[in-house]
Amino acid sequence: MIDVNNEYTVKIESVSSDGNGICHIDGMAVFVPYTAAGDEVKIKITNVKKRFAEGVLTEIIMPSLDRTTPDCGIFGKCGGCSLRHIKYEKQLEVKRDIINNAMRRIGGFKDFNVSEIIGMENPTRYRNKTIFHADKNSVGFYSAKSHTVVPVTDCAIGAEENAEIINAISEFNMTELFTRKSFSTGDIMVCVKAENTDAKKLTAAVSGACKSVKSIYLNGENIYGSAAITDTLCGIEFRISPESFFQVNPVQTEKLYAKALEFAGLDKTMTVMDIYCGIGTISLCAAKKAKRVIGVEIVERAIDDAKENAKLNGISNAEFYARGAEKIVPYLVKSGEVPDVVILDPPRKGSDEKTLGAILRSKPERIVYVSCNPATLARDARFLSDGGYTVSKAAAVDLFPHTSHVETVVLMSKVSREPSLLQL
């Protein structure tokens, strides 16, 4: 019987969707962080549930051929980079398996296979946004599954300038710091949450330490420089405010959007509906290829940015609605909007049946689903499949090297059968 504190020697069989190694003891699945498929290891059980258990790695007896030495001093301590101990090319295989398993097991697409996964040539320093937390003693990241701060002076996947900013700001009574960097201009935005902090002293410290800082916010108020910075994706300039959703890896985002637009197959006769459009990144890229684009997003500030971004780039064939997709999409369809192509890029929780049902009623020729969560992608793709669409193509783009997260693009094409009453 498996029990807490029991120790075992096991061989890791595979890697789970959250990056933990999987082994089996007496028929029960055991999840062990920071292990790789093929590892022979000693583990200690830390938690036992009805159907699975959790353990920690105590010793590597025989390392897997997939292993590499992590190039990070806080690997295994902070809550990020759960796959940094695995060779990068193997990380891509793990992510392909995660997607395939979700689509087959959850979605019921038995023959599903990701045709390609696009990795990074240089999977380091790729994040344009980094969030740090602080306690009385240090600035850093939360450790896994806790609010304990792991001190950090630098992060190998974040901007190099973060080290200068952390050093300058550590003397202030801060609770949170996040930075944004424009990869096209090099400009940096610094946003600080702090109590009893002198804005002038903070500004002097940060701007003096890092000349690339062009915008500083303190507790939500712009105290230095511009209210936003700009970055360029696919030849389009985007205005980014503190609240804006903007993909964290611009290098790979361009590849992601290129793949989504390839699947969309747009021409200048087509109307596109972009659901969960954020600040209009995909919408404005699509507008260059389509007759008309309709963008939908629940966050009003993001829609303000989307409209501003359209003006900034001289794009007049994109319109935006600030309302929840589950409300505005059914309304637009009922009002007679008939998109040729629907692109949706929902948050991790996926879409919902009201939105998906409205998409089915609009009968677009193609649906391009961009997802950061294979499980909810599989669920929603099954709903759309039952409503008359088939999975035609699928590709993955690695926006998050060294983590278990991955972006997937799926093309669903209309087939002859009509949606069932459940979808309508």
State where each predicted segment sits.
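Terminal RNA-binding accessory module
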Residues: M1-P70, I74, S146, K327
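Rossmann-like S-adenosyl-L-methionine
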Residues: I2-E7, K11-S17, N196-L424
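Short acidic-glycine loop/turn motifs at beta-strand connectors
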Residues: D26, K49, A134-S138, A144-S146, ...
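A short linear hydrophobic-aromatic micro-motif
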Residues: I43, M174-T179, S392-A396
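Extended interfacial segments that mediate partner engagement and assembly in macromolecular machines
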Residues: T58-P70, G76-M174
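Short, solvent-exposed loop/turn elements at beta->coil junctions and helix N-caps
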Residues: S115-P123, T179-R180, N219-E221, A396-L399
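Nucleotide donor/acceptor-binding cores
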Residues: N128, I188, T269-M270
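Internal alpha/beta scaffold segment
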Residues: V149-K181, T185, K193-Y217
